[in-house]
Amino acid sequence: MIEDETKGENKMNRGRLILTNIIGLIVVLAIIAGGAYYYYQSTNYVKTDEAKVAGDMAAITAPAAGKVSDWDLDEGKTVKKGDTVAKIKGEQTVDVKSIMDGTIVKNEVKNGQTVQAGTTIAQTIDMDNLYITANIKETDIADIEVGNSVDVVVDGDPDTTFDGTVEEIGYATNSTFDMLPSTNSSGNYTKVTQKVPVKISIKNPSDKVLPGMNASVKISE
């Protein structure tokens, strides 16, 4: 009887040992797989979530001083280059024309308002050719070339991954264009990783994608 119980306990112990070994093996394999995936991702892609949706923008401006008239385009309306969108009535009546194809995204004036030459009537953006501006670390920029494919996810449409292509790589870091570049009078220099702007085209963005939205990009090396 005691011998049978001992045999039963030994079998249970062996079973627990086998189960423990199996679980340990699964954990080890999961760690190896995770490490391999991380290595593959880090060596084959450049990623950043420091990116925004952008589009070519142009202001429709008053060509002369006077009062605005015949301005009846709401935000969201499209215009073509050369379209007469309003008139300025001053010493003479002058047409206000759009300087590019685009969509009205912000109205700046109302009919009857007095404006000076150069006053912005409205802001337009080319919504048909939106793109991504991504800031890439200087340590990663050598791994990127024009023509590289890109996976783009926009925060405004997070369930969709858009196809993209690297179109342009900046010739200077963002800090180069700071109005007041930092100076260091103490003599102590702190090295900061710089960012280079990269322009990425987006193929067939949805209506949910709007200029200024945040985005994440994964660029194939």
Swiss-Prot record:
SUPFAM superfamilies: Single hybrid motif
Pfam families noted in UniProt: CusB_dom_1, HlyD_3
InterPro entries: CusB-like_dom_1 (IPR043602), MFP (IPR050739), Single_hybrid_motif (IPR011053)
UniProt keyword terms in alphabetical order: Cell membrane, Membrane, Transmembrane, Transmembrane helix
Residue spans crossing the bilayer: 17-37
Compartment annotation: Cell membrane
A cellular component term, taken from the record's GO annotations: plasma membrane
Lipid bilayer topology: Single-pass membrane protein
Keyword field contains Cell membrane: yes
Family statement drawn from the similarity comment of this UniProt entry: Belongs to the membrane fusion protein (MFP) (TC 8.A.1) family.
Name under which the protein is recorded: Putative efflux system component YhbJ
Species this protein is from: Bacillus subtilis (strain 168)
